[in-house]
């Protein structure tokens, strides 16, 4: 069984609406506040949570009250601004759960790429208000923490309404959808429509969350629905201004226990790069969301020995992966292709060992457990903490899993 979240966005999506829906689903506010303290930004804002009504429907409303600075208020004007590298350092030093950390970094990097393209500069050089603001950090990191706490493994999103009109921003008055939102939509080819409401319905933060995390856009996938969380928007609209997150589970196919997915394969041959650089390239690619990276020895023109670099990634991280390849290698071009891959149904469980908790990845085929693998990062952290070999921790985790699974009757 795979835990799914479907974002239904009849009046759009914003970061505070995501937070509200997740809190409505039961995510502890204290959990979010604890991690915000670790981000060292808790002194910059106050999180206000309340139950409100939108067109007679009750939903959870979240307001990020910032420490004010002089100047007129505006929807896209924030008190605290940061560049992308500073935000990355905050996230990486906060000790977030690994998946929440990865999602948060991916969302901010995709938003930075979009803003960079809009303004014609490198993402790391963009000093832009929406990403650098404290409330964007709270919205994005809080959303990722909430999804991780709920155990969500796959996310989907409805088509998004375009909205209309204009909005005041740090760069002046902008047409809605604002340029960064359009850029994010274009990257994922998001289906959009006009619902007749001419307001800003999709914010850059909301668009970045949706385009980074959602596997696809459209109607909800087949699922067994367990809960619905309602997150309220700020405006009173002609429709209930509510984001609904459907939380449920999708069973593996009875026939095979596998599911197909679309991935993008990037390839390039290189014959003039210092071999020492490839380790750094691998790390940089995995940091921006690559699923797999590998190299092969090849013979190139003029009988030169070379390296074929292959990167497998999801469609939403193609741009970030290509940026790393162009920046960190000597290649002049990258081939891109779409492929289908079949993946076993997977599940993550936590097992207690003598050294501490370790996450275990379980894989199923024909609804039968076929593979059990302790997570590398958990084993490595315990090995370093207790001065043990990684192999010793790995074997202890496997042994603990099989012993405890026999007790509870797992097959």
UniProtKB/Swiss-Prot annotation:
GO molecular function: lyase activity; nickel cation binding
Coiled-coil positions: none
Tagged with keyword Manganese: no
InterPro entries: Ni_insertion
Keywords of the record: Nickel
Highest taxon of source: Bacteria
Classification via Pfam families: Ni_insertion
Signal peptide interval: none
This protein's name: Putative nickel insertion protein
């Amino acid at each position: 069984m795979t835990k799914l979240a479907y974002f239904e966005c009849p009046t759009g999506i914003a970061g505070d609406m995501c937070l509200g829906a997740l809190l409505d689903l039961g995510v502890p506010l204290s959990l979010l506040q604890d991690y915000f303290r670790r981000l060292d930004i808790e002194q910059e804002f106050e999180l206000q949570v309340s139950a409100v009504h939108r067109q007679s429907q009750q939903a959870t409303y979240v307001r990020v009250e910032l420490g004010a600075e002089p100047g007129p208020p505006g929807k896209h004007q924030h008190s605290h601004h940061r560049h992308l590298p500073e935000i990355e350092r905050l996230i990486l030093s906060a000790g977030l759960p690994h998946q929440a950390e990865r999602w948060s970094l991916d969302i901010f990097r995709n938003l930075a790429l979009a803003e960079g393209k809009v303004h014609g500069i490198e993402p790391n050089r963009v000093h832009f208000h929406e990403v650098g603001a404290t409330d964007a950090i709270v919205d994005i990191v809080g959303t990722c923490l909430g999804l991780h706490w709920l155990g969500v493994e796959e996310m989907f999103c409805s088509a998004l309404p375009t909205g209309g009109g204009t909005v005041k921003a740090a760069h002046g008055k902008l047409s809605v959808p604002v340029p960064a939102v359009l850029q994010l939509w274009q990257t994922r080819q998001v289906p959009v429509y006009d619902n007749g409401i001419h307001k800003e319905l999709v914010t850059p933060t909301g668009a970045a969350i949706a385009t980074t995390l959602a596997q696809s856009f459209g109607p909800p996938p087949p699922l067994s629905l367990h809960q619905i969380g309602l997150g309220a928007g700020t405006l009173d609209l002609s429709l209930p201004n509510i984001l609904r997150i459907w939380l449920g589970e999708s069973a593996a196919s009875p026939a095979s226990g596998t599911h197909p997915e679309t991935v993008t394969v990037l390839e390039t041959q290189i014959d003039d790069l210092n071999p020492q650089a490839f380790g750094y390239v691998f790390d940089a690619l995995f940091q921006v969301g690559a699923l797999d990276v590998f190299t092969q020895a090849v013979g190139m023109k003029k009988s030169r020995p070379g390296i074929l670099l292959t990167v497998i990634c999801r469609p939403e991280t193609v741009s970030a992966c290509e940026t790393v390849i162009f920046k960190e290698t000597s290649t002049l071009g990258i081939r891109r292709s779409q492929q289908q891959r079949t993946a076993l149904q997977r599940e993550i469980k936590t097992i207690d060992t003598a050294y501490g908790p370790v996450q275990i990845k379980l894989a199923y085929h024909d609804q039968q457990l076929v593979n059990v693998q302790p997570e590398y990062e958990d084993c490595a952290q315990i090995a370093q903490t207790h001065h043990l070999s990684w192999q010793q921790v790995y074997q202890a985790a496997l042994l603990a899993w099989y012993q405890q699974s026999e007790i509870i009757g797992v097959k």
